[in-house]
UniProtKB/Swiss-Prot annotation:
GO terms for molecular function: rRNA binding; structural constituent of ribosome. This is Small ribosomal subunit protein uS8c. Its main location: plastid. GO terms for cellular component: chloroplast; ribonucleoprotein complex; ribosome. It comes from Pinus koraiensis (Korean pine). The gene is rps8. It is found in: Plastid, Chloroplast. One of the primary rRNA binding proteins, it binds directly to 16S rRNA central domain where it helps coordinate assembly of the platform of the 30S subunit. Belongs to the universal ribosomal protein uS8 family. Part of the 30S ribosomal subunit. GO terms for biological process: translation. Keywords: Chloroplast, Plastid, Ribonucleoprotein, Ribosomal protein, RNA-binding, rRNA-binding.
Amino acid sequence: MGNDTIANLITSIRNADMVEKGTVRVTATNITKNIGRILLREGFIEDVREHQEGQKSFLISTSKYRRRKKRTYMTTSKRTSKPGLRIYSNYREIPKVLGGMGIVILSTSQGILTDREARQKKIGGEILCYVW
């Protein structure tokens, strides 16, 4: 039984936001790096960087908070496709999250993409998670 690094990343960020902890450290893999870059680009997190400790590589994510309120921009995230049950979609059937306010992160043949990028390129793939 392997580790689900995507669920670990999403759960760690969500738990850190609930206790108002600013940074999260998770194991770095190619998928978690790409998801971190997407969350940074879409404005859900403030910073993401890679940290090396000996042979192990970690991804350090910093949450982005609203000005006066201590709430984060990333209100909820949900892991959709799991190791035991993969969920695939073509580009026409990719769901919209909150009418386009959230994003769907997909694993496609051209890499990890958001729902908008996948629709634009007209490619489908495995639905990894929803973020809003």
